[in-house]
Amino acid sequence: MSLHPEIAAVTDRIIERSKPGRAAYRALMTQQREGGVGRPRLGCANLAHAYAGTDEQRDAMKDGRRMNIGIVTAYNDMLSAHAPYYRYPEQMKVWALEAGATAQVAGGVPAMCDGVTQGYAGMELSLFSRDTIALSTAIALSHNVFEGAALLGICDKIVPGLLMGALRFGHLPMVLIPGGPMRTGIANSAKARVRELYAEGKASRDELLDSEIAAYHGKGTCTFYGTANSNQMMVEAMGLHMPGAAFINPGTKLRQELTKAAVQRLPEIGWNGDDYRPIGEIVDERAIVNAAAVLLATGGSTNHLIHLPAIARSAGIIIDWEDFDRLSRAVPLLARVYPNGSADVNGFEDAGGPTFVIRELLRGGLMHGDTLTISGDSLAAYGQHPALEDEKLVWCDHAEASGDDTILRTIDAPFSEEGGFRILSGNLGRACIKVSAVERDRWTIEAPCRVFSDQHAVHDAFTAGELDRDIVVVVRFQGPRANGMPELHKLTPPLGVLQNKGFRVALLTDGRMSGASGKVPAAIHLSPEAIGGGPIGKLRDGDIVRLCAEEGILQALVDPVEWDARELAPAPPPELGTGRELFAMMHQADEAEKGASAMLAAAGL
């Protein structure tokens, strides 16, 4: 089918805006490519150091004619999603040798779990761990002894950080290799209900802990459709996975065969062959639009309104929130996965999963089908699902209908004609809102505000019964330059309790919410942020705030003369400890719409 005119128009807008940056990026990648393979140009002592830690691969490496794959791993066993990676490098080295290549662990990158740090000091390091991961990826690949790379990462900041670093080595072919979601525990809705009961004082700490352990019970990605699983959806659409690899459970034969296929695909797309597919050419403007389209079609995480612009900038591409807003009005909502529905990602995969969504969007002309991928010269392969036949990996066509139309639908009968995001603007600045999980009658909230500068103060006010009314809860000084833009997901249960009581409730913040957040309308990522002089700093308790996702309005209903005359509230002193003082570079970060990166800002990218 021909490309939808709005998809084409947004893509053209991005291409035009990105011309200088993209041209400079491609020129740099061409320069690196034309410099030739690194190993033949290294000194013998340098090479000896590179090979010293190897055993059975040393002779093959010394030969110099095989691709040497650099494995960049985000393994740790504190993060359940990454725990399966423990044995991956050993297996990958064997599979590489079978394919006539070699492989080494080039380096490790940090991988923090937002689920562990949520609501605590460590969360203030979360967003800027992404820059650290990008820098660590660059260090790993800087040894110049690799002709390709395999990136092992899944979770919130890890995939964006890996991509940001990897794209500065855009002349190399690369694959991302996921680990898959843990199997389903208790229902996410049941978990959320216990959290609300605990917030109301109706469930004990032991009951809450038992519920959480029943939900997060094993190795693999958390099963809700938050940022980690949105990452996987995005990477599929960009053509950087083996098709359909995203949501196959760990420890299965199919998972193993997909990982093997990814490793053995790299030598086939290397720069010394006839099918050279460098990551810098795969990730172009069309791939970025495709990533945005699948996120919108599935109600993906709001964090990608920050991450995707940062990834794009690393490849010389500029995408802004207006692009997301325009795409959201063209792309229908095809999936309802918790927190946008009741099913988890395992149910989503059983109903058809990412490959069904991609097939449908291609069928409707809502994605670019002619993009370069690691698999082929079009995205069509990503509309087929992987399977095993006689123990061999194959890809099969989907049935015409979804396996469960309460979870996943075709473009002919979507859950909504539009996607899940909206941009809001007015005298408070510019913010975004995820509406895919918000009931339509709550798309507009107009109520007095209560202003906080700390999320813990919100909890205290809730416990004291001070928020039991129609209210817009304002939490400011939470932006990237203030304190690292922590997620405020811990506010979801108390705000949900207020909403359940019948009050009309909304959140307004220059910070972030988790990709797991849902039913309470939240205007987030507000720019400019309070510490940068943003007008959110003018709000006072009792001001009427109007948030309207229907009309794209975010307005303080204050007399204009009074509003202009108001002074900004002073910023609270920065919190120290837990290593936060080492991340002072956050104070030089770009605004959220540009990706909220201090690293990219300093690099002039």
Regions found by a protein language model. Give the residues of each.
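Catalytic or ion-coupling anion/metal-binding cores of large enzyme and transporter domains
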Residues: 1-77, 81, 90-107, 120-122, ...
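Glycine-/small-residue-enriched capping loops at alpha/beta junctions
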Residues: 84
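Acidic/charged coordination and interface sites in well-structured regions
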Residues: 87
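N-terminal small/polar loop signature for handling phosphorylated ligands or for N-terminal nucleophile
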Residues: 106-144
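Contiguous domain-boundary segments centered on the initiation and propagation of an alpha-helix
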Residues: 130-137, 144-149, 459-467
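A short, small-residue-rich loop immediately preceding and capping a beta-strand
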Residues: 137, 141-162, 175-178
